[in-house]
Regions:
Chain B
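Alpha-helix N-cap/helix-start and coil->helix boundary motif
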Residues: 74, 100, 196, 237-238, ...
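ABC transporter nucleotide-binding domains
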Residues: 2, 9-204, 208-210
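A structural detector for beta-sheet-dominated domains
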Residues: 5, 12, 34, 65, ...
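C-terminal coupling/interaction segments
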Residues: 259-312
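ABC transporter nucleotide-binding domain
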Residues: 174-267
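Short loop/turn segments at beta->alpha junctions
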Residues: 98, 219, 287-290
Length: 504, 312
């Protein structure tokens, strides 16, 4: 307790030196709270559309947290501040944690306070509305509670976002030695960390696994705080874990901070591993954005890579240095390609075997083709069938006859095996990577397979997975399925009554 | 007491933005600073004075050697640092503070901080309490930081070029205030300055560093007497350097003007006179050196600013 009080006293001492920031952040968040709270309630001028400005002010209030981080950790950016702060009677642990506490007072607390106030006002306002009064009087507590929880989730999103940004800011502040680098590396790192898991999922697992996977929440647990609100099924507990990871990162960065002294103050980046890590993540992010315009992406990323090196190194430019940096970029791109190639060869690091990604219960696989000559496989919750283009008129699902889980798995394993058994070639790799895209070599023979999930999306829509197989592989798969007795020949299907298509 | 033993400090300019070079800022420095003294750090620009001060105050992490303050390590030691106050050679970091804000800031770190001393000294130096320090002159900023340092009531006060920017009258006043406040309570003052006269006047001990190496350290009087100037005259021909060196004296500088030879010799006066008397001469005169002359001749002997110093 005595130790905390001492750290708190130091944190308050640090906080007092950032009065301008305190005023600015509270003005932003205060007005954000006002706009969100008064929306369509008391003032006619504040139409619902104004709410976006409330969110915007909150977003700006959150983003400028990086400024607070830079200010609080200024002892790492300037030898003058190092002289003052590192000679003060504090151990490195006391200094670091007093800084974290100062960051809490400066930025995290205002976001939590104004966000909390907004949630309280909105909840009270909603509970006073006619609709709420109706449910209140009818005793429909579920509805009453649901809306309150929704605002609580929004509050947790504020908290998760601000903690995420500040944690990334602290990471960069501890690894950088100048204000500018701490600033722009914070935003680069925050962006990469936010989108990279999704891009890795899309590019490395989904594309090369030959399927679309259901959004795995655990996969995005830390970095999806910004988008969590848009996914109503993003569990609240994951938001709490999200906050926990950010706090843990801030605490763990102490072990890097304690190794630093004033000697590294003023160096653009004090930790080479950090610099190369961020640069690799940035290149990977950029090259995973859109596979169909790889040439443009390579050029834009290369220019950005070079510019960041010029800014960061602050050296006199020479042709040799630029050549070295371009060489480094080429190696980084090669690594990204190798990573993609590894994913291609392993079918998305084995992601192909997660079809369907959710439970088999009620899952059904539909294989269709828009080629007139194509045949197709239909796998329903209780069976599989092959049909051809003539069956496009067929709508709805056939009432399935019960099929055991074991048989479902057998059928799915055959689908997985054929997906994994696709012929590998560099041409195919580069084509699917997006480096080659011409009419001549476009894969005309790919057949789309759609796996319908039992699980429904945020708007109760049916969740699907899209798989692609070459035509000849589809035929082989259909034959194997038929041979195994899991499906019947399409001629039989066409003439059989629907009710008996999916026997067994 | 501060014991510095075999301290070596290297700056490796590695990593992002570094050119890979290594600069040895301090090489095998060993010094003892007794309690209650006023200790002066002398040295040329870039000699390593500020680096040594930063090591003393735990701003830099020690690489080789040891620094013990009352038997304890400084680095990462809050209790040792609570007995030290460091004023560096810049004031830009205080620009956003008011003097009152600076008081509150340091008060939250130093439990021994005395408001009474702070307000008394601020009044004495007529410094405005609620004006931003960015509007202060350089001298006023210096005074403000020194006041805070004194009010922190630490056992050790470390001042790096603390009197820079002060006019002569204010310089004297601040020096008087520092010596009164510090010596009254038996505290130790460590200061660096390029102004040797100032060190000569204020300090009872000093050290000289050049290019990271310790040239000498000890009591000022002893330093002054560790070298002296000898003027020799011989009517028929000037005494040559070789003749003098044969006597075994350590010559820092030798010059002639007609039949008069002037030599700066390292060592005690009596001993030097005894050795030099072996050389035939008509007149031999021993002239004590000032600290400034010792400083100049020692650095000159090491090739520092040779051309400039020779011209002067």
């Amino acid at each position: 307790m005595k130790c905390f009080l001492r750290i708190n006293r130091m944190a308050l001492g640090e906080t007092r030196t950032h009065t301008k920031f305190i005023v600015i952040v509270n003005i932003l968040l205060g007005f954000g709270c006002l706009l969100l709270s008064l929306e369509k309630s008391y003032i006619d001028l504040l139409h619902a559309d104004w709410m976006i400005f409330g969110y915007l002010l909150f977003a700006v209030g959150g983003i400028i947290g990086t400024m607070a981080v830079i200010g609080v950790f200024r002892d790492l950016n300037s030898i003058q501040y190092s002289d003052v702060q590192m000679s003060l009677p504090m151990s490195s642990a006391q200094r670091y944690f007093s800084k974290l506490l100062a960051l809490f007072y400066l930025h995290i607390f205002p976001v939590l306070f104004w966000g909390g106030l907004t949630v309280v006002i909105k909840t009270i306002e909603k509970h006073n509305s006619e609709v709420y009064r109706f449910f209140w009087t009818t005793g429909d507590w579920d509805f009453f509670w649901y809306e309150s929880v929704d605002w609580f989730r929004l509050y947790l999103c504020f908290a998760a976002s601000v903690l995420f940004l500040d944690a990334v800011g602290v990471l960069c502040a501890v690894c950088c030695g100048r204000r500018a680098e701490t600033g722009y590396f914070s935003y680069i790192a925050a962006y990469c960390l936010s989108v990279l898991p999704g891009l890795i999922r899309n590019r490395l697992l989904q594309t090369w696994g030959g399927q679309t996977m259901e959004a795995g929440h655990a996969f995005f647990v830390w970095t999806w705080s910004f988008w969590a609100k848009t996914y109503t099924d993003f569990p609240t507990y994951l938001l709490l874990i999200n906050c926990g990871i950010s706090i843990a990162l801030m605490v763990l960065m102490y072990f890097v901070y304690r190794r630093r002294d004033a000697g590294t103050a003023g160096r653009p980046v004090s930790n080479r591993v950090f610099f190369e890590g961020v640069m690799f993540a940035a290149v990977l992010t950029m090259l995973s954005l859109n596979g169909s315009r790889y040439g443009i992406l390579l050029t834009i990323t290369g220019i950005a890579y070079l510019v960041i090196h010029i800014i960061t190194f602050r050296e006199q430019l020479s042709c040799r240095k630029i050549a070295v940096w371009l060489g480094k970029y080429a190696v980084t791109v090669l690594l990204v390609f190798l990573l993609n190639f590894a994913a291609y060869m392993t079918n998305g690091f084995g992601a192909v075997y997660y079809i369907p990604s959710e439970s088999l219960d009620g899952a059904h696989v539909v294989v269709t083709t828009n080629r007139t000559t194509g045949s197709a496989v239909f796998y329903a919750g209780s069976g599989l069938a092959i049909y051809n283009e003539r069956m496009e008129a067929y709508d709805g699902y056939v009432a399935p006859i019960s099929m055991s889980d074991e048989l479902k798995r057998d059928a799915i394993r055959i689908v997985q095996r054929h997906l994994a058994a696709q012929e590998k070639s560099f041409t195919d790799f580069f084509q699917r990577l997006g480096l080659i895209e011409t009419e001549e070599n476009w894969r005309h023979d790919l057949v789309n397979i759609t796996v319908f999930q039992t699980k429904t999306g945020p708007d109760q829509e049916v969740m699907t997975q899209s798989l692609f197989l070459p035509y000849h592989e589809i035929n082989a798969m259909a034959e194997e399925l038929e041979d195994s007795g899991l499906v019947r020949a399409m001629e039989d299907l066409w003439y059989d009554s629907y009710a008996h298509q999916f026997h067994r | 007491m501060i014991e510095i033993a075999n301290v070596t400090m290297e700056f490796r300019n590695k990593g992002v933005g570094g050119d890979g070079s290594t600069l040895t800022a301090l090489r095998d420095i060993s010094v003892t600073i007794p309690d209650g003294c006023v200790y002066g750090f002398l040295g040329s620009n870039g000699a390593g004075k500020s680096t040594l001060m930063r090591l003393l105050c735990g701003v830099y992490r020690l690489q080789k050697g040891t620094i013990k303050v009352d038997g304890r390590d400084v680095w990462n030691n809050a209790s040792v640092k609570s007995e030290m106050f460091f004023v560096n050679d810049e004031t830009v970091q205080y620009a956003d503070f008011t003097l009152e804000g600076l008081r509150k800031y340091y008060r939250s770190y130093y439990e021994t901080f005395s408001d009474e001393v702070f307000y008394r000294l601020a009044k004495q130096l007529q410094l405005p309490l609620n004006r931003k320090m960015s509007s202060f002159s350089k001298g006023m900023k210096r005074q403000a930081v020194v006041i805070v340092g004194l009010a922190s009531m630490t056992k050790y006060l470390v001042l790096d070029e603390a009197f820079d920017g002060l006019d002569p009258a204010m310089r004297k006043m601040v020096k008087d205030i520092i010596t009164d406040e510090m010596l009254d309570r038996g505290a130790t003052l460590i200061l660096s300055s390029h102004n040797i006269a100032e060190i000569n006047e204020l300090c009872d001990r000093a050290l000289l560093i050049h290019k990271g190496e310790l040239v000498f350290d000890g009591e000022i009087d002893k330093i002054r007497s560790c070298a002296c100037k000898v003027q020799l005259m011989r009517k028929d021909s000037a005494i040559t350097r070789e003749e003098l060196e044969k006597t075994g004296v350590d010559i820092l500088k030798y010059s002639t003007m007609g039949s008069v030879a002037q030599v700066i010799v390292r060592g005690a006066g009596d001993e030097i006179m005894q050795k030099i008397s072996a050389v035939p001469n008509d007149v031999c005169e021993l002239i004590p050196l000032t600290l400034e002359e010792v400083f100049i001749y020692e650095l000159e002997a090491r090739g520092y600013g040779h051309e400039v110093l020779s011209e002067n």
